[in-house]
């Protein structure tokens, strides 16, 4: 695998940017919106109609359509919107990194075009709550297309040395959650940059999200969810694919393996043999991956405020609201 990036903009994907020449009118909030696409239907156009009239500073959207006529139509109809057309296939985290790079606001709201986006999705009360939270990401709760609540509060758990994530319902306001479900939430730009953004070398969406989010916690920031911030899926909700693959091994070494001692973190050399046994990698490939991760942890050693064992132990008390 490639060298692990140290900053969110170190390996931004190449792209073409269209539109965004006109300023948004009636700006009310220091928030820009990144609208991600995975629905080939007509929901994107409806969503953009709502978003440009909702008081946000800027609207950015990723456009993956091969229909140049439709894209040109969008650009003409929504001159306030910045359309990003990637030159190659990109991961969700890479899209958010690029959206954050283009974002000129204090906050970036990440959404999907298969969510029901209605008028006044934000109000002064919600924005003030987000800003007062001082968290790295403020996350919504979700219902599916038949209005059933989706368990989106994610809790870390270690059982017999194995790390796992336990989902549950969000009941209380300002509930801590391990990661933003489906990448959706209001990201604080300053904190996003300070923790390095999403790792573009991790291709699995699940492990990429978990890597960013656990790093956020281990480096002393917080991720919060609230039932007053809510979205519904137009169709079926996303399925979280936690298949163990090469992305998992990089996630594991960066987040689960580090040990925190005396105000810094490191990966003990002795951990290599345990990693090699558990991975499906050859000895030489396991050693290469281990060295890359150990080097990355060493460069970021003093950013860590805890390790995964402390985070999991404290989740049941300080981090469990």
Model-derived segments and spans:
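A short, conserved alpha-helix in the catalytic core of glycosyltransferases
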Residues: 179-187, 191-196, 202-229
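Glycine-rich, basic loop-to-helix element that forms the pyrophosphate-binding segment
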Residues: 86-103
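N-proximal low-complexity "stem/linker" segments adjacent to membrane-targeting elements
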Residues: 1-49
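Short beta-strand-to-loop acidic/aromatic patch adjacent to the donor-nucleotide binding site
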Residues: 106-116
């Amino acid at each position: 695998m490639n060298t692990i990036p140290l900053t969110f903009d170190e390996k931004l994907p190449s792209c073409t940017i269209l539109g965004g020449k006109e300023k948004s009118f009636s700006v009310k909030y220091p928030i820009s919106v990144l609208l991600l696409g995975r629905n080939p239907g007509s929901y994107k156009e409806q969503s953009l109609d709502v978003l440009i009239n909702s008081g946000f500073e800027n609207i950015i959207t990723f456009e993956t359509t091969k229909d140049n006529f439709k894209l040109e139509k969008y650009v003409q109809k929504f001159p306030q919107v910045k359309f990003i057309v990637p030159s190659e296939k990109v991961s969700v985290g890479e899209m958010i990194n690029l959206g954050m790079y283009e974002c000129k606001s204090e906050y970036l709201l990440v959404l999907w075009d298969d969510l029901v986006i209605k008028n006044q999705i934000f109000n002064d009360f919600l924005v003030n709550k987000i800003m007062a939270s001082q968290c790295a990401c403020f996350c919504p709760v979700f219902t599916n297309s038949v209005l059933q609540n989706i368990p989106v509060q994610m809790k870390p758990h270690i059982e017999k040395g194995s790390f796992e994530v336990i989902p549950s319902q969000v009941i209380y306001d300002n509930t801590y959650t391990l990661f933003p479900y489906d990448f959706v939430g209001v990201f604080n730009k300053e904190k996003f940059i300070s923790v390095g953004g999403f790792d573009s070398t991790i291709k699995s969406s699940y492990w990429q999200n978990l890597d960013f989010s656990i790093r956020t916690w281990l480096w002393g920031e917080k991720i919060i969810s609230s039932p007053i911030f809510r979205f519904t899926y137009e169709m079926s909700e996303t399925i979280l694919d936690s298949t163990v693959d090469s992305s998992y091994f990089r996630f594991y070494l960066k987040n689960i393996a580090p040990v925190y001692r005396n105000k810094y973190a490191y990966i003990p050399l002795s951990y290599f043999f345990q990693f090699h046994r558990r991975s499906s990698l050859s000895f030489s490939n396991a050693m290469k991956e281990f060295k890359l991760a150990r080097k990355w942890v060493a460069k970021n050693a003093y950013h860590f405020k805890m390790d995964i064992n402390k985070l999991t132990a404290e989740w049941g008390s300080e981090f469990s609201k």
